[in-house]
Amino acid sequence: MGAMLMCMLHTQAHSNVWKYVDENGVTHFTNQPPGKDAQLVIRSDTSALPVTPLIEPQGSPDAAAHRTVAIMHASPAYQAVQSSLTAASVSHGVDYELLKAVVAAESAFNPNAVSHKGAVGLMQLMPATARRYGVQSEPGSSISSKLTDPEINISAGTRYLADLLRLFGGKTELAVAAYNAGEGAVMRAGNRIPNYKETQAYVKKVMAVYRVLQIR
């Protein structure tokens, strides 16, 4: 299935590609819009870098994570932003492997990814969140357009993740949950992972990839 998707992404280079998560928390990519909750990850009018698919077919989450990491490390899209990820990791004190796992889950390393909610870029930042970290609009350049710049996106996203790690006492799973659902949702859940299917699947996915990256 992973090979079939890679073929689709290359042969559909000038078509839109959507990402969606089914009721079992499995991520899929398709060239047909599957519904309102789908996330557009490749636009037909952009020359986006190849994406790293986060497909989790039948099998354990750890097996899927190993597969994801292998594809990621061979991806030109990942290789293009390695230096930016390294710099942000050092500057803001966030584990480099955790950053990689979050970006893989958020955008599959597509800098032009845009969600139906308006989150943009590699780390899928909302413009309001990016504004908190110094990203400002300028004449002819909106915050959303600036967030397609990998360095700007990674810098702001890493600072946000660093703040979440501090807020939740270095508990990685809670910080990851807050990155997906918002810090308020984690606090309302009593500083636990909220009982949202999407968030719970997201945390499992990020942590599985993170564990694999830590031992490689």
Positions of predicted regions on the chain:
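Short, cationic interaction patches enriched in Lys/Arg with P/S/T/G and frequent prolines
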Residues: 5-80
